[in-house]
Amino acid sequence: MVTIHIKNVGPLKDTGEIALNRLLLIIGKQSSGKSTFMKVLCHCRWVEKTLMVDDDSSAKDYSKEHLFIESLKTFHRFNPDFFSSDSYIKYDGDYITIEQNGDDTDAVITRKSDFEDRRYNTKLCFIPSERNLISAVKNLDRTYKATELDILLNYLLEWDEVKDYYSTKNALRLSVARNIQYYNDGGADFIYLSQNGKKLPVFYASSGVQSAMPIEVMIDRYCAFVGEKASLSKHDWKQVSNDTSKANYQSVQFFIEEPEQNLYPMSQKDLILNIVNHLLMANKKGQKDSSIVLTTHSPYVVSVLNVLLSQARYCDLHPIYDVNVDDIVDYDHYMPSKYYSAYYINDNGTFENLIDSELPMISGVELDGVSDWVEENISKVNELIYG
Protein backbone atom coordinates (compact mmCIF):
# COMPACT_ATOMS: atom_id res chain seq x y z
CA MET A 1 0.00 0.00 0.00
CA VAL A 2 1.16 3.53 -0.78
CA THR A 3 2.41 5.42 2.30
CA ILE A 4 3.69 8.90 3.09
CA HIS A 5 5.56 10.28 6.09
CA ILE A 6 5.94 14.05 6.58
CA LYS A 7 7.91 15.85 9.28
CA ASN A 8 8.38 19.54 9.99
CA VAL A 9 6.49 20.97 7.02
CA GLY A 10 4.38 23.97 7.99
CA PRO A 11 2.16 23.03 10.94
CA LEU A 12 2.86 19.31 10.47
CA LYS A 13 5.33 18.09 13.08
CA ASP A 14 5.28 14.35 12.44
CA THR A 15 2.46 12.56 10.63
CA GLY A 16 3.88 9.12 11.12
CA GLU A 17 3.54 6.69 8.23
CA ILE A 18 0.11 7.29 6.68
CA ALA A 19 -1.32 4.78 4.21
CA LEU A 20 -3.23 6.00 1.17
CA ASN A 21 -6.54 4.14 1.11
CA ARG A 22 -9.34 4.31 -1.43
CA LEU A 23 -11.02 6.86 0.83
CA LEU A 24 -8.80 8.86 3.16
CA LEU A 25 -10.40 11.48 5.43
CA ILE A 26 -8.32 14.17 7.16
CA ILE A 27 -9.90 16.13 10.03
CA GLY A 28 -8.40 19.06 11.88
CA LYS A 29 -8.87 22.60 13.09
CA GLN A 30 -8.17 25.63 10.92
CA SER A 31 -4.48 25.94 10.03
CA SER A 32 -3.75 22.50 11.46
CA GLY A 33 -2.13 21.24 8.25
CA LYS A 34 -4.94 19.40 6.45
CA SER A 35 -4.30 21.12 3.12
CA THR A 36 -0.54 20.94 3.65
CA PHE A 37 -0.70 17.17 4.00
CA MET A 38 -2.99 16.74 1.01
CA LYS A 39 -0.91 19.00 -1.24
CA VAL A 40 2.34 17.21 -0.43
CA LEU A 41 0.68 13.84 -1.05
CA CYS A 42 -0.84 15.07 -4.32
CA HIS A 43 2.53 16.35 -5.51
CA CYS A 44 4.17 13.00 -4.81
CA ARG A 45 1.41 11.21 -6.69
CA TRP A 46 1.82 13.62 -9.59
CA VAL A 47 5.57 13.06 -9.80
CA GLU A 48 5.00 9.30 -9.76
CA LYS A 49 2.38 9.58 -12.51
CA THR A 50 4.79 11.69 -14.59
CA LEU A 51 7.52 9.10 -14.25
CA MET A 52 5.15 6.25 -15.10
CA VAL A 53 4.09 7.74 -18.45
CA ASP A 54 7.19 9.73 -19.46
CA ASP A 55 10.69 8.68 -20.36
CA ASP A 56 13.76 8.44 -18.13
CA SER A 57 14.55 12.15 -18.30
CA SER A 58 11.66 13.03 -15.96
CA ALA A 59 13.13 11.06 -13.08
CA LYS A 60 16.49 12.69 -13.60
CA ASP A 61 14.91 16.16 -13.74
CA TYR A 62 13.06 15.80 -10.43
CA SER A 63 16.22 14.49 -8.80
CA LYS A 64 18.36 17.54 -9.55
CA GLU A 65 18.42 21.31 -9.07
CA HIS A 66 15.96 20.96 -6.17
CA LEU A 67 13.16 20.53 -8.72
CA PHE A 68 11.00 18.26 -6.56
CA ILE A 69 10.72 20.62 -3.60
CA GLU A 70 10.78 23.84 -5.62
CA SER A 71 7.96 22.68 -7.90
CA LEU A 72 6.03 21.63 -4.78
CA LYS A 73 6.39 25.13 -3.33
CA THR A 74 5.50 26.90 -6.57
CA PHE A 75 2.60 24.80 -7.77
CA HIS A 76 0.86 24.52 -4.40
CA ARG A 77 1.72 28.10 -3.40
CA PHE A 78 3.54 27.21 -0.20
CA ASN A 79 5.14 29.85 1.95
CA PRO A 80 8.91 29.19 1.76
CA ASP A 81 8.99 29.34 5.57
CA PHE A 82 6.98 26.10 5.66
CA PHE A 83 10.19 24.24 4.86
CA SER A 84 13.48 24.08 6.75
CA SER A 85 16.57 21.94 7.11
CA ASP A 86 14.50 19.71 9.42
CA SER A 87 11.77 19.08 6.85
CA TYR A 88 11.38 15.48 5.74
CA ILE A 89 9.13 13.77 3.17
CA LYS A 90 9.21 10.02 2.55
CA TYR A 91 6.82 8.73 -0.10
CA ASP A 92 6.61 5.01 -0.79
CA GLY A 93 4.46 4.81 -3.89
CA ASP A 94 3.15 2.10 -6.16
CA TYR A 95 6.34 1.89 -8.18
CA ILE A 96 8.72 4.60 -6.93
CA THR A 97 10.00 6.02 -3.67
CA ILE A 98 10.73 9.69 -3.03
CA GLU A 99 12.81 10.94 -0.12
CA GLN A 100 13.33 14.64 0.55
CA ASN A 101 15.64 15.59 3.43
CA GLY A 102 15.71 19.30 4.23
CA ASP A 103 14.77 22.20 1.98
CA ASP A 104 18.09 22.76 0.24
CA THR A 105 18.79 19.30 -1.14
CA ASP A 106 17.79 17.19 -4.11
CA ALA A 107 15.12 14.53 -3.67
CA VAL A 108 16.21 10.91 -3.95
CA ILE A 109 13.84 9.18 -6.36
CA THR A 110 14.14 5.42 -6.79
CA ARG A 111 12.24 3.17 -9.14
CA LYS A 112 11.12 -0.17 -7.76
CA SER A 113 12.27 -3.37 -9.41
CA ASP A 114 8.98 -4.05 -11.21
CA PHE A 115 8.51 -0.47 -12.41
CA GLU A 116 8.89 -1.11 -16.14
CA ASP A 117 6.45 -4.01 -16.20
CA ARG A 118 3.73 -2.52 -14.02
CA ARG A 119 3.67 1.24 -14.59
CA TYR A 120 0.34 2.67 -15.70
CA ASN A 121 -1.49 5.91 -16.43
CA THR A 122 -3.79 7.61 -13.95
CA LYS A 123 -5.82 10.83 -13.85
CA LEU A 124 -5.26 13.26 -10.97
CA CYS A 125 -7.66 16.00 -9.90
CA PHE A 126 -7.11 18.51 -7.08
CA ILE A 127 -10.31 20.44 -6.27
CA PRO A 128 -9.29 23.37 -4.04
CA SER A 129 -11.34 25.28 -1.49
CA GLU A 130 -11.30 28.22 -3.92
CA ARG A 131 -13.32 26.19 -6.46
CA ASN A 132 -16.37 28.47 -6.32
CA LEU A 133 -14.30 31.29 -7.85
CA ILE A 134 -15.13 29.92 -11.30
CA SER A 135 -18.76 30.79 -10.57
CA ALA A 136 -18.45 33.75 -8.22
CA VAL A 137 -15.95 35.76 -10.31
CA LYS A 138 -16.89 36.59 -13.88
CA ASN A 139 -14.30 35.75 -16.56
CA LEU A 140 -11.88 34.39 -13.97
CA ASP A 141 -10.14 32.30 -16.61
CA ARG A 142 -9.19 35.51 -18.42
CA THR A 143 -8.49 37.73 -15.41
CA TYR A 144 -6.46 35.37 -13.22
CA LYS A 145 -2.79 35.93 -13.91
CA ALA A 146 -0.01 33.64 -12.76
CA THR A 147 3.62 33.88 -13.79
CA GLU A 148 3.94 30.10 -13.40
CA LEU A 149 1.49 27.21 -13.40
CA ASP A 150 0.01 26.95 -9.91
CA ILE A 151 -2.81 24.97 -8.35
CA LEU A 152 -5.52 27.53 -9.10
CA LEU A 153 -4.50 28.02 -12.74
CA ASN A 154 -4.27 24.26 -13.15
CA TYR A 155 -7.77 23.91 -11.71
CA LEU A 156 -9.07 26.48 -14.22
CA LEU A 157 -7.44 24.53 -17.06
CA GLU A 158 -8.96 21.27 -15.82
CA TRP A 159 -12.37 22.95 -15.57
CA ASP A 160 -12.06 24.07 -19.19
CA GLU A 161 -11.22 20.48 -20.10
CA VAL A 162 -14.49 19.06 -18.76
CA LYS A 163 -17.19 21.75 -18.87
CA ASP A 164 -17.89 21.63 -22.63
CA TYR A 165 -19.00 18.01 -22.29
CA TYR A 166 -22.16 19.12 -20.48
CA SER A 167 -24.21 20.73 -23.22
CA THR A 168 -27.90 21.62 -23.11
CA LYS A 169 -28.62 18.09 -24.33
CA ASN A 170 -26.28 16.51 -21.79
CA ALA A 171 -26.91 18.53 -18.64
CA LEU A 172 -25.80 17.14 -15.28
CA ARG A 173 -28.36 16.89 -12.49
CA LEU A 174 -26.81 18.00 -9.20
CA SER A 175 -27.15 15.70 -6.20
CA VAL A 176 -27.21 18.65 -3.77
CA ALA A 177 -30.26 20.15 -5.51
CA ARG A 178 -32.21 17.62 -7.55
CA ASN A 179 -34.24 20.31 -9.32
CA ILE A 180 -31.06 21.91 -10.72
CA GLN A 181 -29.04 20.82 -13.74
CA TYR A 182 -25.68 22.19 -14.85
CA TYR A 183 -24.73 22.77 -18.47
CA ASN A 184 -22.32 24.84 -20.53
CA ASP A 185 -23.41 26.92 -23.48
CA GLY A 186 -20.84 28.67 -25.64
CA GLY A 187 -18.23 28.59 -22.87
CA ALA A 188 -20.59 30.04 -20.24
CA ASP A 189 -21.83 28.06 -17.23
CA PHE A 190 -25.56 27.85 -16.58
CA ILE A 191 -27.99 26.09 -14.29
CA TYR A 192 -31.43 24.97 -15.37
CA LEU A 193 -34.25 25.07 -12.81
CA SER A 194 -36.57 22.21 -13.67
CA GLN A 195 -39.42 23.38 -11.41
CA ASN A 196 -40.02 26.51 -13.48
CA GLY A 197 -38.10 25.81 -16.69
CA LYS A 198 -35.81 28.80 -16.25
CA LYS A 199 -32.08 29.06 -16.77
CA LEU A 200 -29.61 31.46 -15.22
CA PRO A 201 -25.85 31.94 -15.18
CA VAL A 202 -24.07 30.08 -12.38
CA PHE A 203 -22.81 33.51 -11.28
CA TYR A 204 -26.28 34.12 -9.81
CA ALA A 205 -26.65 30.70 -8.14
CA SER A 206 -26.54 30.20 -4.39
CA SER A 207 -23.15 29.88 -2.68
CA GLY A 208 -23.87 26.21 -1.95
CA VAL A 209 -24.51 25.42 -5.61
CA GLN A 210 -21.43 27.42 -6.65
CA SER A 211 -19.32 25.38 -4.23
CA ALA A 212 -20.75 21.92 -4.91
CA MET A 213 -21.27 22.19 -8.67
CA PRO A 214 -17.54 22.07 -9.58
CA ILE A 215 -17.07 18.95 -7.43
CA GLU A 216 -20.02 17.17 -9.01
CA VAL A 217 -18.96 18.05 -12.54
CA MET A 218 -15.32 17.10 -12.01
CA ILE A 219 -16.00 13.75 -10.34
CA ASP A 220 -18.59 12.82 -12.94
CA ARG A 221 -16.34 13.57 -15.91
CA TYR A 222 -13.04 12.40 -14.43
CA CYS A 223 -14.47 9.06 -13.32
CA ALA A 224 -15.77 8.63 -16.88
CA PHE A 225 -12.17 9.03 -18.12
CA VAL A 226 -11.16 5.75 -16.44
CA GLY A 227 -10.62 3.16 -19.16
CA GLU A 228 -10.54 5.79 -21.90
CA LYS A 229 -7.57 6.97 -23.96
CA ALA A 230 -5.32 9.42 -22.18
CA SER A 231 -4.64 12.89 -23.53
CA LEU A 232 -0.98 12.74 -24.53
CA SER A 233 1.34 14.58 -26.87
CA LYS A 234 2.22 13.00 -30.22
CA HIS A 235 5.68 12.21 -28.86
CA ASP A 236 4.24 10.43 -25.82
CA TRP A 237 1.68 8.58 -27.95
CA LYS A 238 4.47 7.08 -30.05
CA GLN A 239 6.03 5.75 -26.86
CA VAL A 240 2.91 4.23 -25.28
CA SER A 241 0.52 3.51 -28.17
CA ASN A 242 1.10 -0.25 -27.90
CA ASP A 243 0.75 -0.31 -24.12
CA THR A 244 -2.88 0.12 -22.98
CA SER A 245 -1.82 0.44 -19.33
CA LYS A 246 -0.20 3.76 -20.25
CA ALA A 247 -2.32 4.75 -23.26
CA ASN A 248 -5.56 4.46 -21.25
CA TYR A 249 -6.34 5.87 -17.81
CA GLN A 250 -6.40 2.97 -15.33
CA SER A 251 -7.61 4.97 -12.33
CA VAL A 252 -8.49 8.43 -11.04
CA GLN A 253 -7.25 10.16 -7.90
CA PHE A 254 -9.18 13.02 -6.30
CA PHE A 255 -8.00 15.49 -3.68
CA ILE A 256 -10.96 17.54 -2.44
CA GLU A 257 -10.77 20.33 0.12
CA GLU A 258 -13.74 20.73 2.46
CA PRO A 259 -16.59 19.41 0.29
CA GLU A 260 -19.12 20.70 2.85
CA GLN A 261 -18.53 24.38 2.06
CA ASN A 262 -21.74 26.46 2.14
CA LEU A 263 -23.97 23.37 2.15
CA TYR A 264 -26.99 22.51 4.29
CA PRO A 265 -26.43 19.25 6.25
CA MET A 266 -28.76 17.20 4.04
CA SER A 267 -26.97 18.50 0.95
CA GLN A 268 -23.64 17.54 2.52
CA LYS A 269 -25.01 14.02 2.85
CA ASP A 270 -26.12 13.91 -0.78
CA LEU A 271 -22.77 15.20 -2.02
CA ILE A 272 -20.71 12.69 -0.02
CA LEU A 273 -22.89 9.81 -1.22
CA ASN A 274 -22.43 11.01 -4.80
CA ILE A 275 -18.66 11.23 -4.37
CA VAL A 276 -18.43 7.71 -2.94
CA ASN A 277 -20.72 6.27 -5.63
CA HIS A 278 -18.48 7.73 -8.33
CA LEU A 279 -15.43 6.27 -6.58
CA LEU A 280 -17.09 2.84 -6.67
CA MET A 281 -17.84 3.29 -10.36
CA ALA A 282 -14.23 4.22 -11.14
CA ASN A 283 -12.88 1.20 -9.27
CA LYS A 284 -15.16 -1.12 -11.22
CA LYS A 285 -13.91 0.31 -14.52
CA GLY A 286 -10.20 0.62 -13.83
CA GLN A 287 -7.43 -1.92 -13.44
CA LYS A 288 -5.81 0.06 -10.61
CA ASP A 289 -7.22 1.52 -7.40
CA SER A 290 -8.97 4.86 -7.71
CA SER A 291 -8.92 6.97 -4.56
CA ILE A 292 -10.25 10.10 -2.88
CA VAL A 293 -8.62 12.21 -0.18
CA LEU A 294 -11.00 14.55 1.66
CA THR A 295 -10.39 17.22 4.26
CA THR A 296 -13.26 18.35 6.45
CA HIS A 297 -14.47 20.30 9.48
CA SER A 298 -17.96 18.88 9.24
CA PRO A 299 -19.48 16.41 11.73
CA TYR A 300 -22.12 15.69 9.08
CA VAL A 301 -19.51 14.43 6.63
CA VAL A 302 -18.15 12.13 9.34
CA SER A 303 -21.67 10.92 10.18
CA VAL A 304 -22.45 10.05 6.56
CA LEU A 305 -19.20 8.12 6.21
CA ASN A 306 -19.99 6.28 9.44
CA VAL A 307 -23.32 5.15 7.98
CA LEU A 308 -21.46 3.86 4.92
CA LEU A 309 -18.90 2.18 7.16
CA SER A 310 -21.58 0.43 9.22
CA GLN A 311 -23.28 -0.82 6.05
CA ALA A 312 -19.91 -1.96 4.72
CA ARG A 313 -19.23 -3.82 7.95
CA TYR A 314 -22.52 -5.68 7.59
CA CYS A 315 -21.70 -6.63 4.01
CA ASP A 316 -18.21 -7.72 5.10
CA LEU A 317 -19.79 -10.10 7.62
CA HIS A 318 -22.65 -11.20 5.34
CA PRO A 319 -21.21 -11.27 1.81
CA ILE A 320 -24.15 -13.20 0.34
CA TYR A 321 -26.94 -10.95 -0.88
CA ASP A 322 -29.98 -10.87 1.42
CA VAL A 323 -33.22 -9.47 -0.01
CA ASN A 324 -34.52 -8.89 3.53
CA VAL A 325 -32.07 -6.03 4.12
CA ASP A 326 -32.51 -4.43 0.71
CA ASP A 327 -34.02 -1.27 2.17
CA ILE A 328 -31.08 -0.82 4.56
CA VAL A 329 -27.98 -2.11 2.78
CA ASP A 330 -27.19 -1.72 -0.92
CA TYR A 331 -24.95 -4.63 -1.85
CA ASP A 332 -24.35 -3.20 -5.32
CA HIS A 333 -23.03 0.09 -3.99
CA TYR A 334 -20.85 -0.59 -1.00
CA MET A 335 -17.12 -0.33 -0.44
CA PRO A 336 -15.54 -2.82 2.00
CA SER A 337 -14.69 -1.25 5.35
CA LYS A 338 -10.97 -1.94 4.88
CA TYR A 339 -10.87 0.78 2.21
CA TYR A 340 -11.76 3.60 4.63
CA SER A 341 -9.15 5.56 6.63
CA ALA A 342 -9.51 8.66 8.79
CA TYR A 343 -7.05 10.76 10.78
CA TYR A 344 -7.20 13.76 13.08
CA ILE A 345 -4.37 16.30 13.18
CA ASN A 346 -3.60 17.11 16.80
CA ASP A 347 -2.60 20.56 18.03
CA ASN A 348 1.04 19.43 18.15
CA GLY A 349 1.07 18.55 14.44
CA THR A 350 0.87 14.78 14.83
CA PHE A 351 -1.71 12.41 13.33
CA GLU A 352 -4.19 10.30 15.27
CA ASN A 353 -6.01 7.34 13.74
CA LEU A 354 -9.78 7.83 14.09
CA ILE A 355 -10.95 4.41 12.90
CA ASP A 356 -12.07 2.06 15.65
CA SER A 357 -10.95 -1.30 14.29
CA GLU A 358 -13.52 -3.26 16.28
CA LEU A 359 -16.67 -1.38 15.23
CA PRO A 360 -15.37 0.07 12.75
CA MET A 361 -16.40 3.72 13.07
CA ILE A 362 -14.81 7.13 12.65
CA SER A 363 -14.57 8.98 15.94
CA GLY A 364 -16.19 12.41 15.73
CA VAL A 365 -15.34 13.53 19.25
CA GLU A 366 -12.75 16.01 18.02
CA LEU A 367 -15.35 17.73 15.84
CA ASP A 368 -18.06 17.90 18.48
CA GLY A 369 -16.38 19.84 21.28
CA VAL A 370 -18.90 22.66 20.91
CA SER A 371 -21.70 20.33 22.08
CA ASP A 372 -20.04 20.03 25.49
CA TRP A 373 -19.81 23.83 25.67
CA VAL A 374 -23.48 24.21 24.74
CA GLU A 375 -24.64 21.61 27.25
CA GLU A 376 -22.56 23.09 30.06
CA ASN A 377 -23.72 26.66 29.48
CA ILE A 378 -27.39 25.80 28.99
CA SER A 379 -27.25 23.81 32.22
CA LYS A 380 -25.82 26.80 34.09
CA VAL A 381 -28.44 29.17 32.67
CA ASN A 382 -31.25 26.73 33.47
CA GLU A 383 -30.05 26.60 37.06
CA LEU A 384 -30.34 30.39 37.23
CA ILE A 385 -33.82 30.34 35.69
CA TYR A 386 -35.34 27.37 37.47
CA GLY A 387 -33.17 27.18 40.57
Where are these regions (language model features)?
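P-loop NTPase switch/coupling surface
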Residues: 1-168, 174, 285-289, 303, ...
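Phosphate-binding P-loop
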Residues: 15-21, 194-195, 244-250, 282-287
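Extended helical coiled-coil dimerization/tether regions that scaffold
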Residues: 92, 129-249, 386
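Conserved hydrophobic alpha-helix in the ABC-type ATPase nucleotide-binding domain
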Residues: 215, 270-275
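Conserved H-loop
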Residues: 254, 270, 290-295, 298-304
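Walker B catalytic acidic pair
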Residues: 257-259
